[in-house]
A protein has these predicted regions:
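A conserved mid-to-late transmembrane alpha helix and its immediate loop/hinge
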Residues: 184, 188, 227, 338-373, ...
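A membrane-periplasm/extracellular boundary helix in multi-pass inner-membrane enzymes
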Residues: 72, 130, 136-141, 233, ...
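Long extracytoplasmic/lumenal interhelical loops at the membrane interface
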Residues: 177-180, 283-284, 290-354
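Perimembrane helix-loop-helix junctions
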Residues: 45-55, 100-102, 242-264
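Transmembrane signal-anchor hairpin modules in multi-pass inner-membrane enzymes, especially those
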Residues: 1-89, 106-119, 151-158, 209-217, ...
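Loop-to-helix entry and N-terminal half of a specific, functionally important transmembrane alpha helix
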Residues: 17-25, 68, 218-224, 373-403, ...
């Protein structure tokens, strides 16, 4: 133990920015919304001081520049936004969270460091999975008078502290909490589900590439905890998307890893499917029964209303109403009599906020990022599993965003920059076929298919 502490001290002296990056990835999802960003800002200052001392310049890469273009346009929308404070503060939040992507791209410049980042992300998700499981089990046992109220782990974990902080802010912040659905350290079950959905494919990558039996067992347990954490949220879309992610990875990796993938699938389906059935009250009666069908109807009403709005307003159609979901909430409330804060769909939300221009900028960014993963020559099983597990995390994250707004808070937004930073680092570390046009993209895609079939 003393030797490990001594090695850690030496590591911090030689590379403090890297140590801060690991701490940020572990702590950011676990701390309150109003604390986590400051951990990131402090870590970035340490990183920048280290880089300046070593006379090195921080790079942002092509993906980083494209993100800066998107965020620059979002900031520019303050000029025509009817809620300029909300627009400016939301854009500023994106610029702040972008610092994580910069840190990952500059600090994770080796394959071992990429694995260390993935292990840290998984460890953080496991903690949230345990908390979420305890919350939902405590609620259920208390509901049937098996344990007293004082023995129930409150959900969200920082519920009391959140209420104190938000009531003392100079501006209003309201959050809707659910006692019958676990939220972990987040303020909402959907936010916890986002964390679990992203970590699920990463835990599979670690399980498939574990070198020892002990590592294999730990990675398997990590996947079980993440699945349990996702199940505890009773989030239908998150559970279904996670299962779809497993199916996709099985199709890609079954030639070499079909036994391991089925080993992972058994506990996954054992805890996730009952969650979906419980939400609809099919196998168990919980406080959230009846809300599921109402929620689906409400989502369709929201989407229909906002599409009607942008099609009826030319300026909103092309350049949007301004970044930030405050104006979206106003439109829904005062024009369509729907008391909802956002679109519950990131594509429609950004269409309302930033118009067709914003959708195009974001679409190019995401397609380019997927292309950078596709460039990598996956000529061995480790690279194949890494590329497709990170790609699956990105797809699941965006897929979940089709039923909920996934950029609603710092702790949810940070996952976008985590995945983009990982994409940049993986692209930097591994051999690739450079994509310059549609022909090279097609050639790279064919190579990926051949590599997949030959594994």
């Amino acid at each position: 133990m003393k030797e490990k502490l001594a090695a850690l001290k030496i590591e911090y002296r030689t590379n403090p920015g890297w140590c801060w990056l690991l701490a940020i990835l572990f702590l950011f999802p676990l701390l309150p919304e109003y604390v986590s960003p400051f951990i990131l800002f402090a870590g970035f200052i340490v990183f920048k001081v280290q880089w300046s001392r070593e006379r090195r310049k921080a790079k942002v890469g092509t993906i980083g520049k494209m993100m800066m273009l998107f965020m620059g346009y979002a900031l520019l929308s303050t000029l025509w936004s009817p809620t300029p404070f909300s627009t400016f503060s939301t854009a500023a939040l994106w610029w702040g969270m972008f610092l994580l992507q910069v840190m990952i791209y500059n600090l994770a410049r080796s394959r071992d460091k990429i694995d260390a980042l993935l292990q840290t992300c998984t460890a953080s998700a496991c903690v949230n999975g345990v908390i979420g499981t305890l919350q939902i089990c405590g609620y259920t046992l208390n509901r049937y008078d098996c344990i007293p109220d004082g023995a129930v782990l409150v959900t969200p974990l920082y519920k009391g502290l959140d209420k104190f902080v938000y009531t003392h802010l100079p501006f209003a912040i309201s959050t809707k909490t659910f006692d019958s659905r676990a939220s972990g350290t987040f303020s909402n079950p959907n936010l916890l589900a986002t964390h679990m959905v992203i970590a699920y494919p990463i835990s599979i990558y670690l399980f498939l590439n574990a070198k020892t039996k002990k590592q294999k067992v730990l990675c398997f347990l990590a996947n079980v905890l993440i699945s349990a954490g996702l199940s505890s949220t009773l989030t239908r879309a998150g559970c279904v998307i996670a299962l779809a992610g497993w199916v996709f990875m099985f199709i890609v990796l079954c030639r070499r890893y079909w036994k391991q993938m089925f080993t992972i699938f058994l506990p996954t389906i054992a805890v996730i499917v009952p969650s979906i059935l419980t939400r609809y009250g099919i196998i168990f009666s919980s406080g959230g029964n009846g809300e599921a069908k109402k929620s689906s109807v409400a989502h369709f009403n929201i989407w229909e209303s906002l599409i009607d709005y942008v099609l009826s307003h030319t300026r909103a159609f092309f350049i949007g109403t301004g970044f930030g979901c405050e104006e979206t909430g106003n439109i829904l409330k005062y024009m369509y009599n729907l008391d909802k804060p956002h679109a519950h769909n990131f594509v429609i939300e950004f269409w309302v906020e930033l118009g067709v221009v914003g959708i195009i900028l974001l679409g190019i960014l995401l397609i380019w990022s997927a292309g950078k993963l596709l460039e990598i020559n996956t000529n061995n099983s480790r690279k194949l599993t890494l590329v497709f597990c990170v790609f699956t995390s990105l797809v699941l994250y965006l897929g979940f965003g089709l039923s909920d707004f996934i950029f609603n808070s710092p702790k949810q937004l940070i996952f976008l920059f985590l995945l983009l930073g990982l994409t940049q680092s993986i692209s930097y570390c591994y051999d690739k076929t450079v994509i310059t046009d549609a022909r090279t993209l097609e050639r790279a895609a064919r190579k990926e298919i051949r590599n997949t079939l030959n594994q």
